[in-house]
A protein has these predicted regions:
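Positively charged, aromatic-accented nucleic-acid-binding surfaces
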Residues: 1-44, 69-141
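Major-groove DNA-recognition helix of helix-turn-helix-type DNA-binding domains
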Residues: 19, 46-74
Length: 141
């Protein structure tokens, strides 16, 4: 995880679970999402999630401070690289979330599982679709 603060070249408020989330594009073209906004949208504790992200061996690489506009002016905020959001979202504990957010997180997690499965089957040259479409287990070799 890098600790230098990036300057955005473009920002845009996007909607996530019917809540505004600030997205920022930085100089190298990467897009970061404000972690505090993501947590608010998913009814998650920001401090706990930031601790989790920073402690995770893989996800910490996607955490970066970006100087973002706030009501008090530009301030450095922790953001998560867009590519890391699906893995983070699929790893959160949904126990304390409202029923609506639990269902949304479940939907996203199942979508992530399907997309990763498709990527694996394509990389391995296996039939697409469900695993029952693989007629010969030797195709897995």
């Amino acid at each position: 995880m890098q600790e230098n603060v990036l300057e955005p070249i473009e920002t845009l408020v996007v909607t996530f679970f019917e809540h505004p989330v600030l997205a920022a594009r930085v100089k190298d073209g990467s897009i970061y999402m404000a972690i505090s906004d993501l947590c608010e949208a998913a009814e998650l504790n920001y401090r706990a999630q930031l601790r989790r992200l920073r402690a995770d061996q893989d996800l910490k690489d996607g955490v970066q401070q970006v100087r973002l506009p706030t009501p008090g002016g530009l301030q450095a905020q922790y953001c998560l690289l867009l590519e890391y959001v699906p893995t983070w979202i699929s790893s959160v504990d949904r126990a304390r979330a409202s029923d609506l957010v639990k269902e949304r997180l479940r939907y996203l997690r199942r979508h992530i599982i399907r997309e990763v499965y498709v990527s694996i089957t394509q990389a391995a040259g296996l039939p697409t679709g469900q695993s029952r479409n693989i007629e010969d287990l030797r195709d897995l070799e």
